[in-house]
């Protein structure tokens, strides 16, 4: 019984950090990755069982490379920022205009900049 209690205690101690809320990252790209996860962006932009392996929104795994080519005259960062703040301004062909409106309203200026930096880093 003592060994079992000791083993259970060890498991709790080892798993506790994994269950704790993630501390806010200070690196903009790391913080952007955190914001991406917190907002649930992967639910629509990554293939999964829930969306039958085809993302609802365009995949973002190489968006940093693709973004500068999407809208002539917009840098990758400007395109990404516009896609978050005004999602209907440009809709990727083959995908519905389903990006949530008002998403940027819920983001601080720093979190929006971090999210843009993270997305721009995906190549």
Language model: regions and residue ranges:
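C-terminal capping alpha-helices of c-type cytochrome domains
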Residues: 20, 99-123
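Generic structural signal for secondary-structure transition and capping sites
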Residues: 41, 88-92
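Short, hydrophobic secondary-structure boundary micro-motifs
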Residues: 53, 92-94
């Amino acid at each position: 019984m003592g060994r079992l209690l000791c083993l259970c205690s060890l498991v709790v101690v080892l798993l506790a950090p994994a269950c704790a809320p993630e501390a806010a990252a200070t690196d903009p790209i790391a913080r952007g990755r955190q914001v991406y996860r917190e907002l649930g962006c992967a639910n629509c932009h990554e293939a999964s069982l829930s969306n039958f392996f085809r993302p609802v929104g365009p995949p973002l795994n190489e968006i940093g490379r693709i973004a500068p080519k999407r809208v002539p005259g917009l840098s990758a960062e400007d395109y990404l920022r516009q896609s978050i703040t005004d999602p209907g301004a440009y809709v990727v062909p083959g995908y519905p205009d389903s990006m949530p409106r008002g998403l940027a309203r819920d983001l601080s200026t720093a979190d929006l900049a971090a999210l843009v930096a993270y997305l721009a880093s995906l190549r």
